[in-house]
């Protein structure tokens, strides 16, 4: 028996309001009618060429689209359709976006230090380490 999806995207379409050279307004459709379910314990890879909408999908799920974006469809988390406000409340607590480029991290610095900042108090360090443990990032990230 299949588990219920933890994340469900149904008929997601994303477009941007743009202007051409003559300042005529038009909609640039970037994602059209995408449906996706992610169940607990699954690992899902979104693959595609540069500019195909992978990051845009993640931004839509996280509620991080710019002002000129238009979105339709449903994004549900744990069975509940999410509003923009609910996406913002979950962001950084139950949902996070890992950037596609690991070059954002300095390979000569400890990862933990980069994530939390150099002058972190004990509570911040403890919270960061707990999050790393949750995602199976061991102590080597601190070395």
Roles of regions detected by a PLM:
Residues 8, 35-37:
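ABC ATPase nucleotide-binding domain
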Residues 47-49:
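The feature captures the beta-strand-to-loop junction immediately N-terminal to the Walker
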Residues 62-65:
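Helix-to-loop junction immediately C-terminal to a conserved catalytic motif
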Residues 70-81:
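Conserved ABC transporter NBD signature motif
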Residues 81-96:
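ABC ATPase NBD coupling module
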Residues 101, 107-121:
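Q-loop/switch helix immediately C-terminal to the Walker
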Residues 125-141:
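Conserved ABC ATPase "signature" region
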């Amino acid at each position: 028996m299949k588990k219920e999806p933890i994340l469900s995207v149904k008929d997601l379409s994303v477009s941007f309001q743009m202007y051409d050279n003559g300042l005529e307004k038009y909609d640039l459709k970037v994602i059209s009618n995408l449906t996706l379910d992610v169940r607990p314990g699954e690992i899902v890879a979104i693959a595609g060429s540069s500019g195909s909408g992978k990051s845009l999908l993640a931004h839509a799920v996280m509620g991080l689209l710019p002002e000129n974006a238009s979105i339709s469809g449903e994004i549900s988390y744990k069975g509940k359709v999410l509003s923009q406000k609910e996406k913002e409340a979950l962001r950084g607590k139950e949902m996070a976006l890992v950037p596609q480029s690991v070059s954002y991290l300095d390979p000569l610095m400890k990862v933990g230090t980069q994530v939390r900042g150099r002058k972190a108090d004990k509570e911040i360090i403890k919270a960061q380490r707990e999050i790393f443990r949750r995602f199976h990032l061991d102590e080597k990230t601190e070395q």
